[in-house]
Structures are given as C-alpha cells and as structure tokens.
Amino acid sequence: MALDSAKKAEIVAKFARKEGDTGSPEVQIALLSARISDLTEHLKIYKKDFSSRLGLLKLVGQRKRLLSYLKRKDYQAYSKLISELNLRDK
C-alpha cells in the first residue's frame, strides 16, 4: 500500500513550494491523501483487514493535524490545497 516512487515524485513536484521541497505541509498533506485513497480502495476489497483500518485512521488524524496547522499559518495555501485535493473545509 505504499506509494511507488514515480507517483510520489509526481505529487512532490506538483505541490512543492520550490525544487527539492518534500517537507512542507502541502506536500505532506498531498502524500497522506494519496496513501489514504489507496488504503480506502484496499479496504473496500478486504473489509476485515482491521490492521489496515487502524493505519488508515492514524493517517487521517495526521492529515487533520497538518491541515489545521496549515490553516492557522497560511490560510491562502490551505484553501488552495483543499480545492486541489477535493477535501472539505471544516
């Protein structure tokens, strides 16, 4: 369920603030969103995979914390990111 390096590099290139940026909240949130969508598809097939379900909940919580941080620090980047990732604003 890990992202392959090509898909990860594509996401990093799309959301990076500058060349080589992998640690900004935007990139981290985009990578987490991709992992969450992959795990969601996995759990649609394997409904009783409770270990993956717990991992999914952990990833969702981490993304939620990063989104609240980004909303607090840079609201314009936050609103742009949630529109690009099709996430709901709370």
From Swiss-Prot:
Gene Ontology BP terms: translation
CDD domains registered for this protein in UniProt: Ribosomal_S15p_S13e
UniProt keyword NAD, yes or no: no
GO MF annotation: an example: rRNA binding
Pfam families named in the record: Ribosomal_S15 (PF00312)
The UniProt record lists the keyword Ribonucleoprotein: yes
Entry keyword set: Ribonucleoprotein, Ribosomal protein, RNA-binding, rRNA-binding
GO cellular component: cytosolic small ribosomal subunit
Domain of life assignment: Bacteria
Classification via InterPro entries: Ribosomal_uS15 (IPR000589), Ribosomal_uS15_bac-type (IPR005290), uS15_NS1_RNA-bd_sf (IPR009068)
Record-stated family: Belongs to the universal ribosomal protein uS15 family.
Subunit and partners: Part of the 30S ribosomal subunit. Forms a bridge to the 50S subunit in the 70S ribosome, contacting the 23S rRNA.
Function: One of the primary rRNA binding proteins, it binds directly to 16S rRNA where it helps nucleate assembly of the platform of the 30S subunit by binding and bridging several RNA helices of the 16S rRNA.
NCBIfam families reported in the protein's UniProt record: S15_bact (TIGR00952)
Name of this chain's protein: Small ribosomal subunit protein uS15
Organism for this UniProt entry: Campylobacter lari (strain RM2100 / D67 / ATCC BAA-1060)
Chain's gene name: rpsO
